[in-house]
Amino acid sequence: MKKKQLYIGVLSVACCALVAIGITLHLLYPKKQIKNLVKTPPVLRLKPLTADTLKKKPVKKMDFNISGTLRDKEGKGVAGVIVSDGFNCVKTDAQGRYKMKRDSLAKFIYYSVPADCEVPTHSKTDRTAFFYQKVSKGKKTYNFTLTRLPGGKEIHYKMIVIGDPQVTNAYSPYYTSPDDNPIKKSDVERFTTQTMADIRQTIQNLPPGTPVYGLSMGDDVQYYGGYNAKLERQIRQALGSSEMRLFSVIGNHDQDGKALYRRKWEENFGPTDFSFNRGDVHYVCINNCFFHRGMAYYSPGELRERQVKWLKQDLALTPKDMKVVLCYHIPFTFGNAPFSKAKPLSNANEQGHYSSSRLSLLLSLLKPFKGGYELFCGHTHFACNHEINYQGEDVMEHCHAAACGNIWQSNINICGTPNGYYVYSFVGTSISNCYYKGTFWDKSKQMTLFRAQTDFNGEKYAKDWQLANNRNILVANVFNATSHWRVVAVEDGKEYLMRRISSKGQDAFAAGYHHKYSESVSYRFVSKGNGYLIMNHLYYYTPRNPNARIIIKASDPYGNTYTASSDEVTTEPFANFAHYYEKEHKK
């Protein structure tokens, strides 16, 4: 009991002392000083997370507004030029000035080369187009200097179109003689000494002063054999090594779904969606390789919403009296690995193929142009001027054969068309001429001939197309043919229309050759097992007299007639133009 009373007494004294101290402090010091005198130990101090106690870091707002001026060499502003960041498009004013809010994801600022100005190039020896500047953080002004063409806008010019150079890091089968002794030569070397050497000769044969431009339809490289950081630069330098000034589309193998690969292409060629003008033609190049899982992409090609938005802006700023040539890699009118909204083709001979979900929209954007439109692509490694009736309209897509053929496994594409390129002549808004130029072939040679019953390493045209095996039927492979060509057989002075084959299938000659010699490309890719290959430039004729000498005449819509004789039929499955070039053999 005494202890308890003692505790109570001590506590009472302590409380009185604390009260006395509190009163004294209150009288002697202001409140702020009291807080400083009596501090809570840090461990016991708790700060409530309120708006008043939290210190906000100032957020620096990025200003994406940019501007610039396009001037000629004399310092005069260039008016009416489309400038873009790959997301938005604006036009320069009367003084050549522009303003725009660039997208935060933009990589380049660039312009659509006007028809009356030169195509700027990377250098005098690398004549690939250089019409862009890389976006720099914090840079607000992007100016460009343009060079006027001495004679103003060109009335006529040539456009050389190259399908799939597709150089790899591997050494592909290469022969210079009718033997089985391969020569070691890289794909870049072959493209340089064969394709580009032939293009330089073609340009040299043109009338002096003829303007010549070039388009690569993509798949400039493929990293087969391993990644090579120098490969895109090597192919760019090869493509730029002639007199033509050249633009390139990006292909699926330039990317293969990898950011690194795409970045390498952009480092060398610039933006993937862009446009330029030559003569009365507006060219639009766009990346339609839509990857959805790793390297897997949609076929037919597709576009993302932001690309559609960009395309609409670009075309809205383009005069409607021009022709538009839409350039891309993967065909829009056929493909057998479709996006869910793609539409199946109605042609029974092309069952399993689809048209792009974007085709209707694209055609609606192109129809208002009074100069018409053209659809240019590559990708397939076979020549195909693909014609479909789409929503009541006849549509043709020019699918260009590959410069590399069957990815440098031979000298031919999987449809039998030789490795090569196309030469277009433009006058105003019209294509006045177009021919296929096989590498090291004379331009007058536009077809190859075969007998239906000839066995090409187990493959026959007779078997593929249900033709008689004992009638000496003549088969003509007319490389650039369309339904507008007239192909006839002349027997005993009389002309007979040849029947055109247009269906999924294979080329017996190409399938047989590649089955033996192709190393890195499977037999399935070149044969009817492909399920993708559309053969629509084969014609056949059953002779009245199986032993008659027959002349084949193929007339195109441009007034050219090409001829070949039954004396020229290919019967040897291996030691032929697919295997080696006479020109190189003679060296």
Regions found by a protein language model. Name each.
Residues D394-A481, W485-D492, L533-S566:
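Binuclear metal-dependent phosphoesterase catalytic core
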Residues L37-N65, D103, D116-G225, K586-K587:
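N-terminal active-site segment of His-dependent metallophosphoesterases
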Residues G505-Y541:
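Aromatic sugar-binding surface patches on proteins
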Residues D126-V135, G559-K587:
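Short beta-strand elements
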Residues A115-S123, A129-G138, T145, G225-P319, ...:
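Extended active-site neighborhood of metal-dependent phosphoesterases/phosphodiesterases
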Residues M62-D63, T69, E74, G80-K91:
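Short amphipathic beta-strand segments in non-cytosolic proteins
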